């Protein structure tokens, strides 16, 4: 996992743009726990939300992100607003000379994502996307096993991410932006599916090149976005698998991944005690107790590793591993799935 932060004489001044649930439960506490960070400001279109977090963490509250981007005391920002506003705010932050951590999905189109990457390159400031699944200890262990060739060449896979829906944990409940297509752009595929798209790319070490999918609004009466999706994916090497995402997992969560190789298979997050299980063709069984994925139902992750990675990149002047381009490629998979669901055809992923 990530090494502890390098201490610096000058703390990194951070502004959190968007003061909803992800800012409240992930970004704010993780920044506050980092010895190299000073939280300078919180921003929200609903002033009371920003004021509440500002009071808790000794920062200032703003209702307009442009006012925060003008502050010399702000070195970096987290973009935690509804999905449709990720790109314009991130681009503005990068153009203002601020390192930028953007929540996922990073944008609503490949074009927007490329504009964000271009802004990062032009400004010389880092752009990182908040894909935390690849930082989880069980997935790091799985990556080690795969790179060691433990289960041979991957031929198939399946991954799932599901829970009862954002209304159970979002600060806005059932009337929140998650269910409004104009603000959210997508539903479960943006909330959950894109996480697994990034995880699969990273674990397999190759691209998803072709997809077929059903991305549907089946149950949630309060919104007009997808609440269930089933996708078939094909990689550049020819491996095939499935990705499913759902907001109708009542109760609890499913966050498991299975990888099938020529020498055996790996189960991730399928056992309450041993989060990594490896079964080999030889009959050998390997059990790893490396920590489970924490759930929203259980209070969420206390340290996703994302903030630590972002801060370390700034301190060491090292480009983040979960870069804008990494975020774009995960987004491209989701966009291809959306296209396939509409066309009822196999669709290529824009690499």
Positions of predicted regions on the chain:
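N-terminal Rossmann-like dinucleotide-binding module
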Residues: 2-57
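Active-site loop of classical SDR/Rossmann-like NAD(P)-dependent oxidoreductases
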Residues: 22, 294-308
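Hydrophobic residues in well-ordered beta-strands that form the structural core
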Residues: 23, 63, 79, 101-103, ...
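Contiguous beta-strand/loop segments that form the cofactor/metal-binding neighborhood of enzyme cores
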Residues: 191, 197-274, 304-317
